[in-house]
């Protein structure tokens, strides 16, 4: 049987604590990272250290349609790679027009009976490499110039109401699952002005997880990277700890 993300995180935390890690629950209000000693101002006081590993993550951007939150996990999803398998032989929809939406639609087309790709414009923003495979997939249908105006449901998703952005006309579309891929928002507000961020506000860090400041490392979805999944985040955590230990050994 599978395991949900929350339970997996709990088990990882418990494992770390068995080896001596200390968990402090606090909200961080301000960070000062440029000095040799890094300082975090929090709801539970001030924490200081010579290294900091940032793993604040990133959240999928919601559509903002009524009922979206309640239906999350009940037909509404944000990750085709994570949640697509149960939709084998079923009808699904993907919302978005960028690379992640195109990749999700292409992946789902290999298992789903039908895939609707819904985009508010009349062409994809995704790179050309996705265009031909999607256009030639017999079970992929494009819904151009369309937005999702309502989620149809009976305790779980049963379909969508689509709105034509040009005419305002609406029609209903039956589907078993909806995959929302309209971007992600990294939790980096605290680090603006402290660390180098890319144009999408992800922390700029290479495969060593080093950031623009010595002694500061970024792991998981919050950093610049090609693939954001649990397995790559866990890998980042191990890498960040390795280089943090190395930094401490070299800067006693």
Please report, for each region that a protein language model flagged, where it lies by residue.
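Generic hydrophobic/aromatic pocket-lining and core-packing "Φ" positions
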Residues: 105-106
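FAD-site-proximal beta/loop scaffold in flavoenzymes
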Residues: 59, 64, 69-86, 182-232, ...
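Residues that mark the start of a beta-strand
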Residues: 90-91
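Glycine-rich Rossmann-fold phosphate-binding loop(s) that bind the pyrophosphate
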Residues: 96-98
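A short acidic, glycine-rich active-site loop
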Residues: 1-8
């Amino acid at each position: 049987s599978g395991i949900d993300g929350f339970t997996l995180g709990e088990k990882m935390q418990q494992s770390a604590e068995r080896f001596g890690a200390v968990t402090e629950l606090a909200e961080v209000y301000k960070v000062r990272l440029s000095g040799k000693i890094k300082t975090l101002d929090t709801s539970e006081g001030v924490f200081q250290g010579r290294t900091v590993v940032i793993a604040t993550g990133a959240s999928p951007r919601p559509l903002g349609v009524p009922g979206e939150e309640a239906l999350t996990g009940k037909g509404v999803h944000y990750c085709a790679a994570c949640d697509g398998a149960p939709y084998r032989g079923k009808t699904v929809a993907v919302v978005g027009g960028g690379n992640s939406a195109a990749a999700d639609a292409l992946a789902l087309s290999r298992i789903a009976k039908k895939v609707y790709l819904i985009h508010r414009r009349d062409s994809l923003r995704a790179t050309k490499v996705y265009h031909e495979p999607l256009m030639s997939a017999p079970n992929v249908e494009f819904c151009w110039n369309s937005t999702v105006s309502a989620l149809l449901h009976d305790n779980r998703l049963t379909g969508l109401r689509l709105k034509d952005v040009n005419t305002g006309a609406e029609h209903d579309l039956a589907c078993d699952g909806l995959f929302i891929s309209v971007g992600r928002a990294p939790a980096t507000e605290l680090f603006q002005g402290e660390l180098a961020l890319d144009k999408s506000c992800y922390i700029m860090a290479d495969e060593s997880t080093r950031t623009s400041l010595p002694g500061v490392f970024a792991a998981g979805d919050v950093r610049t990277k090609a693939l954001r999944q649990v397995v790559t985040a866990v890998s980042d955590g191990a890498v960040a700890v390795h280089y943090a230990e190395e930094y401490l050994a070299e800067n006693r």
